[in-house]
């Protein structure tokens, strides 16, 4: 039974049901210091009803309460403080972890419901930059977390492969491009063209107009325009898939904006049939004043569609195809207003399922405090950063363990894992500065620190070379360090649920750091392999810790090497 439930049931019985179990569970607190117990109930909540001071109420409850399952229950001022039975709790938690293994913390909350996750979405014909990392790894982690809780995540790479920028790129290719040069080095050459034509379009309205005309041709099915566009797309995907392979991220569908180009007329006609479209300066808009939003521009004066038109078609397609229980969009915080407009237009059209669409925004990655910008050519390729992280990891592994057999493979796991972990430990809505020195460090709150704790446990277990009978373990939790680990292990299922509820992988990453820290304190204070009556209990404790560390890392898309 969950410790909050245990405390709440005992309290509700002690106060004759004045507060129900759920009411009590909602106000149970954790004391600031573990010396004051594991959980605390503030008696202020009963003062008015019982017409007594909170201090008196706390004292009366502590005397009356059934202490079964607790080491002791005491009154501390206006609080009733509960100390859990350490040995019983440890036995229960460790047996549960060792029995369930990687499935510890699993739940069937989602009951198989589909959850499409719009993620990564790099732009065709542009480098896969560090700026694309967040959507990719946050989306991948949320998918793993949701799958653990019984949902069916559907990872969709909504490639940026449609829009006026491709008209401009075709313009640049026709003016300056060379097929052989681009074929030899596609992304770099296309980036040069993109930066050059954007600079020209800013200065010369005729260049901008030419780009607009080429995009219009794409929308109208012009053979030459689509042939060049498809070539850009094909060479880009080859590069992207290589990078996804390094990241260890896969997708269920690659569905770019172009996939929906023939589905937009239907959504525009639907809005028109419901009298939602209004003309404004020759363009078609949906008035969203009642939502305190600016009008949504659906079609421009020249008939070209916009980002929101394509997203309306996308949302309708996903509902029809996947019948989702939730539809997540892991897209940067700068798009918040766009998603508010998107949901509002769908709501106006009578699609209440739009309530199940969730924008999962995130903060920006900078380097040296500066924003990445492809238009200006200020771009750092993610692949180069990953390769550099792996090189740094290999040097550290060489220094720590020169005789490690599979150094190169472990270096990949540590280097790539370091970059992903650093991103995911950052609160989603916050940004961070991309700093490889900090990321790949084996000290501090980093991925390598957590991985090293897991590898250290595996090393101890190999050295012990002893099979532990989980049904016959003596677990005497006599030290504070072991108890901290037990409490952390017990909390893991709640951590997974909290991460899912808030679309927040950082909850898992921070938990993994705290569990690794708890183990390292235990390792420093306890002779784990001492041959005494408690040896099997200690091995069971660290084995359970290893299982949960590995699973926490897996939920973040980070490997857990057995050796480092």
Swiss-Prot record:
InterPro entries registered for this protein in UniProt: Arg-tRNA-ligase (IPR001278), Arg-tRNA-synth_N (IPR005148), Arg-tRNA-synth_N_sf (IPR036695), ArgRS_core (IPR035684), DALR_anticod-bd (IPR008909), Rossmann-like_a/b/a_fold (IPR014729), tRNAsynth_Ia_anticodon-bd (IPR009080)
Annotated compartments: Cytoplasm
SMART domains per the UniProt record, alphabetical: Arg_tRNA_synt_N, DALR_1
Enzyme class: ligase
Keyword Nucleotide-binding belongs to the record: yes
Gene3D superfamilies, per database record: Arginyl tRNA synthetase N-terminal domain, HUPs, Isoleucyl-tRNA Synthetase, Domain 1
Residue span of motif 'HIGH' region: 122-132
Alphabetically ordered keywords of this record: Aminoacyl-tRNA synthetase, ATP-binding, Cytoplasm, Ligase, Nucleotide-binding, Protein biosynthesis
Reaction(s) this enzyme catalyzes, per UniProt: tRNA(Arg) + L-arginine + ATP = L-arginyl-tRNA(Arg) + AMP + diphosphate
Assigned protein family: Belongs to the class-I aminoacyl-tRNA synthetase family.
Subunit record text: Monomer.
NCBIfam families assigned: argS
Listed name of the protein: Arginine--tRNA ligase
Organism: Lactococcus lactis subsp. lactis (strain IL1403) (Streptococcus lactis)
